[in-house]
From Swiss-Prot:
It is a single-pass type III membrane protein. Residues 33-683 are cytoplasmic. Belongs to the ATP-dependent AMP-binding enzyme family. This is Long-chain-fatty-acid--CoA ligase 5. InterPro entries: AMP-binding_CS (IPR020845), AMP-dep_synth/lig_dom (IPR000873), ANL_N_sf (IPR042099), LC-FACS_euk (IPR045311). Catalyzes the conversion of long-chain fatty acids to their active form acyl-CoAs for both synthesis of cellular lipids, and degradation via beta-oxidation. ACSL5 may activate fatty acids from exogenous sources for the synthesis of triacylglycerol destined for intracellular storage. Utilizes a wide range of saturated fatty acids with a preference for C16-C18 unsaturated fatty acids. It was suggested that it may also stimulate fatty acid oxidation. The gene is ACSL5. Coiled coil: none annotated. The keyword Metal-binding does not apply. It comes from Homo sapiens (Human). SUPFAM superfamilies: Acetyl-CoA synthetase-like. Keywords: Acetylation, ATP-binding, Cell membrane, Disease variant, Endoplasmic reticulum, Fatty acid metabolism, Ligase, Lipid metabolism, Magnesium, Membrane, Mitochondrion, Mitochondrion outer membrane, Nucleotide-binding, Phosphoprotein, Signal-anchor, Transmembrane, Transmembrane helix. It is linked to Diarrhea 13: An autosomal recessive disorder characterized by neonatal onset of recurrent vomiting and diarrhea, leading to severe failure to thrive. The chain crosses the membrane at residues 12-32.
Length: 683
């Protein structure tokens, strides 16, 4: 007993004391620096609840009131930007760079002032401060795009984005449909397209073109011959400064943008989006992640996804509402990695196509068995931490395996949001493990202003698109033709809320097809409520067709399954009502096909491999195997395929600007090959 007393209360030797203090300091340092888990704030087994009428809402939404805004002083996009100016204390707003140079920044006040000057110029040129006054914006992502858009909002006008890749016919359609008299564009080349349409008598309403980039006198003179005034953006802003008008801010219910959707068939439809639509969607995102991620003026987003798409518009609304910054890529997607390393963004909006490319590159670099083993072990270890809510990028595996990937995206990413297309479980799991940041998946479409469901913080499972956002309800409706019934928690996804658009511009027939009499938006997607209350997109109602024997076919569902085949980069599944079977056009993966063929004992150039019968039959066999494993019925399997060496792309007219297959164009383009495949089957 005396020994214990002496041990406890006798002075310790200096070395022992130092050891104890060092150990204590280490424990204290670990306690204050250890990663704080991002834990769910609700029961992940019960993420949404039913309400009257068969719809569902997120369980965190305590009442049935739908979110319309996050901040009382930011109910329109004009107010959102002014709030950003205030909370950032006129901090940096829009960043741009030239090759091999750092980013240069325009402050919030500079952007606001330039928007007021440009808007004043529009009024001086005869435009009115009215939500039925449409201004075209025909440019790639850059600061002047935002200045042009904000100029519209500052004076209650409506922005009408034109896609870079829409093509001349669609541009004619949009200019005429929206009766656009003025277009703000970036390059002389685009101005020539617009002038050419006027010269041919296609777009008589167009009277003024404002150009961001320098242009020569020849362009101006050519425009004048067609009755078009050509102005530089610099001169337009100076003109507006001389004839300044006070801002005429819009109301939340006023139109903000006409977003023309890239239809897979027919002319683009102009979705009428209000200020409240955009603000409510951005507010719902902030509400969804409020305890896990709170944007600050120190945050930076990279802008490379088209500003003509609502996904990118919502991201930027979130950024400006919190006084954060947006850095624009140089305009060349091949330089995006360099832009990100320079910008070091904290918010990274992404699409599966880009993430898949990064994922494939990492997988291909892990060539040896040891590298593959270490990569798999690293992902598994990090994902186990993630399941406990621990998100970090300073672990042993980060330093050994993932640092290079993180650095390629700038090394500071806090949040990745992916949308626009389904994300595979393997890719989602990889990025959640590798990036050491929060990775969320969103689902929606233009007509609901970009998003209607979102995965929740703390739920790091994959294979679903989350729960309804606080700005909308979601319900399913029976699709009897496809054997989907709500009694089985399956059906067409329908949306109602403050984010649902007002209809299609001057197209009541298409509007009635999309919006029913009760205000529900019918998406054309087939969803399933999972037991935990999350939504899974399982099929597509549109683009279905019937085979000769009466069986309904949803080709996109089949294509999504076949895309899991390693040698397949793209696939188009085709069927006809007078035919009893399906055929397909496959674009092989240039990185995979040579090794795939080598295992079959076949060598040659990529084009030669595409023409090789042994290779073609092996790929067909692989497709049918994957289809069977995935539950495809016999009539849903392709019976013959053609291997095409050139990818489907926007440039060759086979994909829409949102990278969806133009099924009608594909059928026409491959008509000869399709007929040959059917003849082969009959033989």
């Amino acid at each position: 007993m005396l020994f214990i007393f002496n041990f406890l209360f006798s002075p310790l030797p200096t070395p022992a004391l130092i050891c104890i203090l060092t150990f204590g300091a280490a424990i204290f340092l670990w306690l204050i620096t250890r990663p704080q888990p991002v834990l769910p704030l609700l029961d992940l087994n019960n993420q949404s609840v039913g309400i009257e009428g068969g719809a569902r809402k997120g369980v965190s939404q305590k009442n049935n009131d739908l979110t319309s805004c996050c901040f009382s002083d930011a109910k329109t996009m004009y107010e959102v930007f002014q709030r950003g100016l205030a909370v950032s204390d006129n901090g940096p707003c829009l960043g741009y760079r030239k090759p091999n140079q750092p980013y240069r920044w325009l402050s919030y006040k500079q952007v606001s002032d330039r928007a007021e000057y440009l808007g004043s110029c529009l009024l001086h040129k005869g435009y009115k401060s009215s939500p039925d006054q449409f201004v075209g914006i025909f440019a790639q992502n850059r600061p002047e795009w935002i200045i042009s858009e904000l100029a519209c909002y500052t004076y209650s006008m409506v922005a009408v984005p034109l896609y870079d890749t829409l093509g001349p016919e669609a541009i004619v359609h949009i200019v005429n449909k929206a009766d656009i008299a003025m277009v703000i564009c970036d390059t002389p080349q685009k101005a020539l397209v617009l002038i050419g349409n006027v010269e041919k008598g296609f777009t008589p309403s167009l009277k003024v073109i404002i150009l961001m980039d320098p242009f020569d006198d020849d362009l101006k003179q050519r425009g004048e011959k067609s009755g078009i005034e050509i102005l530089s953006l610099y001169d337009a802003e100076n003109l507006g400064k001389e004839h300044f008008r006070k801002p005429v801010p819009p109301s939340p219910e006023d139109l903000s943008v006409i977003c023309f959707t890239s239809g897979t068939t027919g002319d683009p439809k102009g979705a009428m989006i209000t200020h409240q639509n955009i603000v409510s969607n951005a507010a719902a995102f902030l509400k969804c992640v409020e305890h896990a991620y709170e944007p600050t003026p120190d945050d930076v987003a990279i802008s490379y996804l088209p500003l003509a798409h609502m996904f990118e518009r919502i991201v930027q609304a979130v950024v400006y509402s919190c006084g954060a910054r947006v850095g624009f890529f140089q305009g060349d997607i091949r330089l995006l990695a360099d832009d990100m390393k320079t910008l070091k963004p904290t918010l990274f909006p992404a699409v599966p196509r880009l993430l898949n490319r990064i994922y494939d590159k990492v997988q291909n670099e892990a060539k040896t068995p040891l590298k593959k083993f270490l990569l798999k072990l690293a992902v598994s270890s990090k994902f186990k931490e993630l399941q406990k809510g621990i998100i970090r990028h300073d672990s042993f595996w980060d330093k050994l395996i993932f640092a290079k990937i993180q650095d390629s995206l700038g090394g500071r990413v806090r949040v990745i949001v992916t949308g626009a297309a389904p994300m595979s479980t393997s890719v989602m799991t990889f990025f959640r493990a590798a990036m050491g940041c929060q990775v969320y998946e969103a689902y929606g479409q233009t007509e609901c202003t970009g998003g209607c469901t979102f995965t929740l913080p703390g739920d790091w499972t994959s294979g679903h698109v989350g729960v309804p956002l606080a700005c909308n309800y979601v319900k399913l409706e029976d699709v009897a033709d496809m054997n989907y019934f709500t009694v089985n928690n399956e059906g067409e996804v329908c949306i109602k809320g403050t984010n649902v658009f007002k209809g299609y511009l001057k197209d009541p027939e298409k509007t009635q097809e999309a919006l029913d009499s009760d205000g529900w938006l019918h998406t054309g997607d087939i969803g399933r409520w999972l037991p935990n209350g999350t939504l899974k997109i399982i099929d597509r109602k549109k683009n279905i067709f019937k085979l000769a024997q009466g069986e309904y076919i949803a080709p996109e569902k089949i294509e999504n399954i076949y895309n899991r085949s390693q040698p397949v980069l793209q696939i188009f599944v085709h069927g006809e009502s007078l035919r009893s079977s399906l055929v397909g056009v496959v674009v092989p993966d240039t990185d995979v096909l040579p090794s795939f063929a080598a295992k079959l004992g076949v060598k040659g150039s990529f084009e030669e491999l595409c023409q090789n019968q042994v290779v073609r039959e092996a790929i067909l066999e692989d497709l049918q195997k994957i289809g069977k494993e995935s539950g495809l019925k016999t009539f849903e399997q392709v019976k013959a395929i053609f291997l095409h060496p050139e990818p489907f792309s926007i440039e060759n007219g086979l994909l829409t600007p949102t990278l969806k297959a133009k099924r009608g164009e594909l059928s026409k383009y491959f008509r000869t090959q399709i007929d040959s495949l059917y003849e082969h089957i009959q033989d």
